[in-house]
Amino acid sequence: MQHFMPASLIAILALAVPAHAQSGGAGHDSAYVRVFDNCTSYQAEDEPVHFSDCAGYGDWTVHIVAGEHGAAVAYSQRGKVTQWGQNPPRAAVFQDLGQVMEWRLDASGAPFATIYRSIFTGYERGDGGQYLTVAALRPDGEVGACHVAYIEAAQQPNANQIARDAADYLAPGWQCGIEEPIVFDLDSEMDVLTIAAQRRPGH
C-alpha cells in the first residue's frame, strides 16, 4: 500500500470511464469512477503538499490536497477550504484514498452524493482502519459539497450498503454548514433509516 508521500501521489491517482451499478433507494443508481486518472497536479511551494484537480462524474471536478500523512477531498471550485476541513475519524497516522469513488445518481441521472474510502495504516501491524465518507453534492450552493456520514468499513460487513443508504436518505436534505456528519459504526444506537425517518417533517 502506498501512502500519500509527494513522490507517490500521482502514481496512485486513476480515473476511468464510469460504470453503472445497482439501484438503491428511491430509484437511485450508482456510477463508479477510479480515483483519479484525468488530473492536473501541482505542489505547494516550500511544503510537501500536493494539489490535484481531477475530472469527476459529468461536469464535476474533484479536488485533492495530499501531504505526507493524509489527504482531503473537495468538489467543484466553491468552498474548497471549507470542504478540506471535513475528514473521517482518523484511525491511524497514514491515510490513503481508495481507488474507486461511487457517485449516487437520481432518477434523471444527475449525481447528488459521492462515497469514497479512506484507508488508514500505522507503524505497527494491526494499526489502522477504514471509513467510507458520504458527501452531499450542492451544485448551486456556496460550498460545492459537504460530508454527511462516516461509515466504519473495516468491521462492518454491510458498510457499502450503509453508505448508500446514507447517500440516498440523508444527503438530499442535508444542511451543509449547519449539520455535523454522523458516524455509523458497531456502537451506533440508530441506523440510517431510523435517523432518516426522524428527520421527516412532522417527526
Regions found by a protein language model. Give the residues of each.
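Short helix/strand-capping turn motifs
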Residues: 88-157
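Charge-rich, low-complexity N-terminal segments
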Residues: 3-4, 17-87
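Short alpha-helix boundary/capping motifs
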Residues: 16-18, 198-199
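C-terminal partner/receptor-binding element of secreted or periplasmic proteins
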Residues: 152-203
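General secretory precursor processing signal
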Residues: 42, 57, 149-150, 179
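Bacterial N-terminal signal peptides
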Residues: 7-16
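Disulfide-bonded cysteine motifs in exported proteins
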Residues: 34, 49, 141, 169-171
